[in-house]
């Protein structure tokens, strides 16, 4: 076992040969490499599978022995400073290694078919393998310097993958937005690392925690304030990377990348890096209570904000992105409360559930592209979907499992972890608990809204004119159910919500239905440049994905069904013996310090019943608003009579419109940043440009013009006669000597002698000039 741990440093570098060999192949043998590009998926999956097997072995050793291994190499720069590099294998690293490798393998397997027709297939697999390498290096780092290096590599890979289709302006803008937003957090992270090194003299985690703890125990107020500041800066890095408020604005725009990378970013890599950093540094944060309170506060704000922003999104991937933001808020809330186990448990269950949902959405998008073309604005638009359960039944089943899991319906994965966080929140703060439980209902609502809009009812794409012709340029399809002008300020009615997926015979609220022209599909050009389609087929309806994509969905369904078993407390002899508790024992748990590690199943069932009831309420409301069953009620005019007699109709419409505007416009946070930050920086740049051009350049050009005009003026004093120059020279010398004699008392005869010689030189020069 010692031998295995000693050489576990190679784990991050096992997937690295893939991008290196792809790059060398494109440089040395470009034609052969491109012609056999599908071959490169095999080594990518094989090498990552080797890492997964090694990670599973290390985790088994961790469970059996609770063993922590750290190996360090010291690089001495001088007598006063040295850098130490190494690797750390502990329970947290083992969990993250398995999570990254399992999700990464399934994403690679899925991507082989999903990206098969894209010209950037090789580039995608090179980026993806390097992404996995960076994340593996991050979770096995033994000090803050290594974490920062791999942290930046993860950010670079996300920039490359979000902007993978960089020829699309919106994708190029999205990757720049993600890069700039994360630079804010990364700058704070770097300052925090340097500050802690200045006060402790070490980057190693163990030394860092021990020294800081000793400094705080000495009741040194200066050290406490400085450690609090450094902890805040470190937390800022996690806020940006995990898309927490207020640095969350990059996450929905990151959906412009290919769907497989969206699944990897939102499940196991980039957003998980911030949660991992807080979990790794939790012993430091526990020493500073203000930071723990801040972590929980940011977490609960993000929980509520992400859920409300997901209520009215029309893009299926953006809806899932805001869902990820909200669930990451739950994890951050748990860490802020000190519930270390619950946070990691939810990180695991959410990773597989969200990977299932994203890969399922990729299968939906893949099926819609055969109808609407390769345009994300159309293939990802839930307004154009509906009724897909008849065309993609396997994808529908997988997506339903992921949806129910995220809603917190037992016995699926997220139910167990989210319920544990909700129970701990009641012990921490009743206000936070109320918000967290309410958000659980919002989660169930917007997730079933996505499911019903996508799979229920009838395929709306056949009833709407989406071709971009003049007849549809003024109107767009609203998620609330009818065609309205694109201006968000226009009012929406509640009845429009109820007819979202109704067919034409029963829904009399859609009065203007434009049939799809037969030549529309021929006029739609691919949005993304592709190579060729060997067996191109034309489909009039969506079709199920290929078996390679469905295999990844099937495996993720199994994970979603059974992965929670590692954290379910099976009671034996008065103590819980679940795998996760054994792996994390001893772990930080501030809310259960005096617990005997015994599960009260009566209390558990009571709390679980409450959380499940909230989730079922959210599902019921979503079904009430989006299920086509209400077309029968419309035929009896029941809804119309109720709606007309309602005295609060105007007020309800205003509330509904406000919620819609808030959600669809992303809480106006992006607009605020655009006006205040972007506008302010542009104004400052214009002011700086004006100052540089008018003031700085004006001064320099003024000196030049002054010299020019002075020279032009002086040139008229010279007539070209040497005697005149000598006479003028003598006069200036006389004036100088006269002034000098006045101040230094120079003898008068010396001055006269100099004037006589100067006058003789002038006469001689004049005569010489006349002779010539």
Swiss-Prot record:
Superkingdom, natural source: Eukaryota
GO cellular component, one term: chloroplast thylakoid membrane
Record function comment: NDH shuttles electrons from NAD(P)H:plastoquinone, via FMN and iron-sulfur (Fe-S) centers, to quinones in the photosynthetic chain and possibly in a chloroplast respiratory chain. The immediate electron acceptor for the enzyme in this species is believed to be plastoquinone. Couples the redox reaction to proton translocation, and thus conserves the redox energy in a proton gradient.
Enzyme class of the recorded protein, top EC level: translocase
Gene Ontology MF terms in the entry: NADH dehydrogenase (ubiquinone) activity; quinone binding
Keyword presence, Chloroplast: yes
Descriptive protein name: NAD(P)H-quinone oxidoreductase subunit 5, chloroplastic
């Amino acid at each position: 076992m010692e031998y295995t741990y000693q050489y576990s440093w190679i784990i991050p570098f096992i997937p690295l040969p893939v991008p290196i060999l792809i790059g060398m192949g494109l440089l040395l043998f470009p034609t052969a490499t491109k012609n056999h590009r599908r071959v490169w998926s095999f080594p990518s999956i094989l090498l990552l599978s080797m890492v997964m097997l090694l990670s599973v072995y290390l985790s088994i050793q961790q469970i059996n022995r609770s063993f922590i291994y750290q190996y360090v190499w010291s690089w001495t720069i001088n007598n006063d400073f040295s850098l130490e590099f190494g690797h750390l294998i502990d329970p947290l690293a083992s969990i993250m290694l398995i999570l990254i490798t399992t999700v990464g393998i399934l994403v690679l397997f899925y991507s082989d078919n999903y990206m098969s027709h894209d010209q950037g297939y090789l580039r995608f697999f090179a980026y993806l393998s390097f992404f996995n390498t960076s994340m593996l290096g991050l979770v096995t780092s033994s000090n803050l310097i290594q974490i920062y290096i791999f942290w930046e590599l993860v950010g670079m890979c996300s920039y490359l993958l979000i902007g993978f289709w960089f020829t699309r302006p919106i994708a190029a803008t999205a990757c720049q937005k993600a890069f700039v937003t994360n630079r804010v957090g990364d700058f704070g992270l770097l300052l925090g690392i340097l500050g802690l090194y200045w006060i402790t003299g070490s980057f190693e985690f163990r030394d860092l925690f021990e020294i800081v703890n000793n400094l705080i125990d000495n009741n040194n107020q200066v050290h406490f304030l400085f450690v609090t500041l450094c902890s805040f800066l470190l937390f800022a890095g996690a806020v940006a990377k995990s898309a927490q408020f207020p640095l969350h604005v990059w996450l929905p725009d990151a959906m412009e990348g290919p769907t497989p990378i969206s699944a990897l970013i939102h499940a196991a890599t980039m957003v998980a890096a911030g949660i991992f950093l807080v979990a790794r540094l939790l012993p430091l944060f526990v020493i500073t209570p203000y930071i723990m309170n801040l972590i929980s506060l940011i977490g609960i704000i993000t929980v509520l904000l992400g859920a409300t922003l997901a209520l009215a999104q029309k893009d299926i991937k953006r809806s899932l992105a805001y869902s990820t933001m909200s669930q990451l808020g739950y994890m951050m809330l748990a860490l802020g409360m000190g519930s270390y186990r619950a946070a990691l448990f939810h990180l695991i269950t959410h990773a597989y559930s969200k990977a299932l949902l994203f890969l399922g959405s990729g299968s939906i998008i893949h099926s819609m592209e055969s109808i609407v073309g390769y345009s994300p604005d159309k293939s990802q638009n839930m307004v154009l979907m509906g009724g897909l359960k008849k065309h993609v039944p396997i994808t529908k089943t997988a997506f339903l499992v992921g949806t129910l899991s995220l809603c917190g319906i037992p016995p699926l994965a997220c139910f167990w972890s989210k319920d544990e966080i909700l129970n701990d929140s009641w012990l921490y703060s009743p206000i936070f608990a109320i918000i967290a439980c309410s958000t659980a209902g919002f989660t169930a609502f917007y997730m079933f809204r996505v499911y019903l809009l996508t799979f229920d009812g009838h395929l709306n794409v056949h009833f709407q004119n989406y071709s971009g012709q003049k007849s549809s340029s003024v109107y767009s399809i609203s998620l609330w159910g009818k065609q309205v002008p694109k201006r968000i300020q226009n009012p929406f009615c509640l009845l429009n919500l109820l007819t979202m997926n109704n067919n034409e015979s029963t829904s009399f609220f859609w009065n203007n239905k434009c049939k799809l022209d037969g030549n529309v599909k021929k006029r739609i050009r691919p949005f993304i440049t592709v190579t060729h389609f060997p067996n191109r087929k034309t489909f009039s309806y969506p079709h199920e994905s290929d078996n390679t994509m469905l295999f990844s969905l099937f495996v993720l369904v199994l994970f979603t069904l059974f992965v929670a078993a590692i954290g379910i407390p099976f009671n034996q002899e008065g103590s819980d013996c679940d795998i996760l508790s054994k792996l994390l024992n001893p772990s930080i748990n501030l809310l259960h310090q005096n617990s005997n590690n015994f599960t009260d199943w009566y209390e558990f069932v009571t709390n679980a019943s409450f959380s499940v009831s909230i989730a079922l309420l959210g599902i019921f409301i979503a079904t009430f608003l989006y299920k086509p069953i209400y077309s029968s009620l419309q035929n009896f005019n029941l809804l119309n009579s109720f709606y007309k007699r309602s005295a609060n109709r105007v007020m309800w419409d205003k509330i509904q419109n406000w919620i819609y505007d808030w959600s669809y416009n992303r809480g106006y946070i992006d607009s605020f940043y655009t006006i205040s930050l972007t506008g302010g920086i542009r104004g400052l740049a214009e002011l700086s440009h004006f100052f540089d051009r008018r003031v700085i350049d004006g001064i320099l050009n003024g000196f030049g013009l002054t010299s020019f005009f002075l020279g032009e003026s002086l040139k008229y004093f010279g007539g070209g006669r040497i005697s005149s120059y000598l006479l003028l020279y003598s006069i200036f010398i006389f004036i100088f000597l006269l002034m000098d004699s006045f101040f230094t008392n120079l003898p008068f005869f010396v001055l006269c002698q100099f004037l006589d010689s100067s006058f003789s030189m002038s006469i001689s020069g004049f005569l010489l000039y006349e002779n010539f």
